């Protein structure tokens, strides 16, 4: 079988609330770290989420 290109990653809130999203990315196409502005329900506002490895 062929190796899959997609890997699961964790998007961790930069507001230090401990909230995170789990998503997938294409490891070959996206070589850098992902960074999104998404809603953090703990902080109740949109903040930057940065990519981290799932342990």
Curated annotation (Swiss-Prot):
CC annotations in GO: cytosolic large ribosomal subunit
InterPro entries: Ribosomal_bL33, Ribosomal_bL33_CS, Ribosomal_bL33_sf, Ribosomal_zn-bd
A Pfam family recorded for this sequence: Ribosomal_L33
Alphabetical list of Gene3D superfamilies matching this protein: Ribosomal protein L33
Record's keyword annotation contains Ribosomal protein: yes
UniProt superkingdom: Bacteria
GO terms of molecular function: structural constituent of ribosome
Keywords tagged on the record: Ribonucleoprotein, Ribosomal protein
PANTHER family: 54S RIBOSOMAL PROTEIN L39, MITOCHONDRIAL, LARGE RIBOSOMAL SUBUNIT PROTEIN BL33M
NCBIfam families xrefs: PRK00595.1, rpmG_bact
Annotated family: Belongs to the bacterial ribosomal protein bL33 family.
Protein name: Large ribosomal subunit protein bL33
Origin species: Acidiphilium cryptum (strain JF-5)
